[in-house]
Curated annotation (Swiss-Prot):
Gene Ontology terms for molecular function: ATP binding; proton-transporting ATP synthase activity, rotational mechanism; proton-transporting ATPase activity, rotational mechanism
UniProt protein name: A-type ATP synthase subunit E
Main location: membrane
Upper classification of the organism: Archaea, Methanobacteriati, Thermoplasmatota, Thermoplasmata, Thermoplasmatales
GO CC, alphabetical: plasma membrane; proton-transporting two-sector ATPase complex, catalytic domain
NCBIfam families: PRK01194.1
Function: Component of the A-type ATP synthase that produces ATP from ADP in the presence of a proton gradient across the membrane.
TM segment ranges: none
Gene that encodes the chain: atpE
Signal peptide as annotated in the record: none
SUPFAM superfamilies xref list: V-type ATPase subunit E-like
Membrane topology: Peripheral membrane protein
Cystine bridges: none
Quaternary structure and interacting proteins, as annotated: Has multiple subunits with at least A(3), B(3), C, D, E, F, H, I and proteolipid K(x).
């Protein structure tokens, strides 16, 4: 399996997971929106009765407050959804080294490192990954608690950081931004 195929498989799997998470988040957001609308309806009926008693000025003030409160409820729930699904995505990424695909991912990371920095670059992987790689030109050190590759050009001037921890941050940031935009639509 070529590096491009593995990367496409990883990207496809990632996109499928993102879609599943986004679909679940959209359903949850629709439910929240319905609850918000129901709450607004109830609040509006209460406030209409008060308006008759206290006048239109008070009514407008209360409705504005209810809308702000309802928006805050939705914002808080959306944040909870982002946190919840972000945590799930984070766990999937952190546990990549425990999957059967990790061997191929690790080999492709090494290939990418050598292609980018030259065949004589210094490639480091976790000591725990020693049994996964048969290449004798690899240094084994504890570089990252979640796995990956840290490569340096032979002269030490260029470093390619493919450690899971580094990649994870970027993926999660993009995931949360995309999920938030899907929820807002």
């Amino acid at each position: 399996m070529s590096l491009e195929e593995v990367l496409k498989d990883i990207e496809r799997d990632k996109e499928e997971k993102k879609k599943e998470i986004a679909d679940a988040a959209s359903r949850e957001t629709a439910k929240i929106e319905k609850e918000r609308e129901e709450k607004i309806q109830i609040l509006q009926r209460e406030y209409e009765n008060r308006m008759r008693e206290e006048g239109s000025r008070l009514y407008n003030s209360i409705i504005d407050k209810a809308n702000v409160e309802a928006r805050n409820i939705v914002r808080m729930r959306v944040q909870e959804i982002l946190d919840q699904y972000g945590a799930k995505a984070d766990e999937l990424i952190k546990n990549l080294a425990k999957t059967k695909e990790y061997d191929d991912v690790l080999k492709k990371m090494i290939e990418v490192s050598r292609k980018a920095l030259g065949p004589d670059c210094i490639v480091k992987v976790n000591t725990a990954d020693k049994g996964r790689i048969s290449d004798g030109n690899i240094k084994f050190e504890d570089i990252d608690p979640y796995g990956g590759v840290l490569a340096t050009s032979r002269d030490g001037k260029i470093e390619l950081d493919l450690r899971i921890s580094s990649i994870r941050r970027d993926i999660l940031e993009r995931f949360k931004v995309r999920l938030y935009s899907m929820i807002e639509d």
